[in-house]
Amino acid sequence: MRILVSNDDGIYSPGLWALVKRLKEVGEVIVVAPDREQSATGTQVTLRQPLRVQKTHPLIPGIEAYAVEGSPCDCVILGLAKLITEPVDLVVSGINHGLNLGDDVLISGTVGAALQGYLRNIPSIAVSIPVTMEEPENLDSAACITAEVSRRIQNGDITKNSFLNINIPDLPLSQIEELRVTPLAHKTHIETVEEGHDGRKRYFWLRRRQLSSADNKKTDIWAIENGYITISALHERLFQQPVFTLKDAETAGILAAARSCQDKI
């Protein structure tokens, strides 16, 4: 099994190398990751400037590793298209230092990187662990869970067209009671804008704040808050597509009314 590993915290992030350490027990690992922090870049792709790549010294011997001056999505696209010459069987993004729950997935560079594998028909995993003021203490817990999920994809126990978002409490696995398959919670954060002045110009900070704790016991946020590991199956739209229908008469009426409006100009 050949595994491309990327992230959005940068190529020297401890979470990435904790993941590599366990995934190398599953298959051949190639790292293609940003050369610097790229959090909250979502699905950003670089189109108006060249991408520069440096083969770099790995923190674990025997691993082929590339640092890219680009986004997490750039890394996976470039890795699959040019840097890795043999077919890739799995894309894994993480371990992100910070959970990716609910609508976080819409702006997550970690999830965005995994999405690029899934869009190319490669099973893909995004994995995250909470972080506060300190570095996570149990990165190996997240790495072991991800390695086991990877084995089950390899063996066919988990469908090979999977796009999975895994979040793991910062605890030893012996203290985690259960792993749950959960849907994403909706409307989990609110953005606010703070204004300041540096003596010359105004500036603004965007702040993202979590809303009150989830009370729906089926969602990923509730499960994590109660000490469970969560696995959420995603697809290219990230959230389930809402049901939206219009009768033929309604669609015709909209078009007719719009034409009438345009005729008045």
Swiss-Prot record:
Task: Specify the superkingdom.
Answer: Bacteria
What chemistry does it catalyse, as a reaction equation? a ribonucleoside 5'-phosphate + H2O = a ribonucleoside + phosphate
Q: Which InterPro entries match?
A: SurE, SurE-like_Pase/nucleotidase, SurE-like_sf
Q: What cofactor is this protein dependent on?
A: a divalent metal cation
Please classify the protein's predominant subcellular localization into one broad category: cytoplasm
Q: Where in the cell is it found?
A: Cytoplasm
Q: Where does a divalent metal cation bind?
A: 8-9, 39, 96
Q: Does the keyword Heme apply?
A: no
Which enzyme type, at the first EC level? hydrolase
Spell out the GO cellular component terms annotated for this protein, sorted alphabetically and separated by semicolons: cytoplasm
Q: Which family does it belong to?
A: Belongs to the SurE nucleotidase family.
Described purpose of this protein according to its UniProt entry: Nucleotidase that shows phosphatase activity on nucleoside 5'-monophosphates.
HAMAP family on file = SurE
What's the protein called, per UniProt?
5'-nucleotidase SurE
Organism field: Dehalococcoides mccartyi (strain ATCC BAA-2100 / JCM 16839 / KCTC 5957 / BAV1)
Q: Which gene encodes it?
A: surE
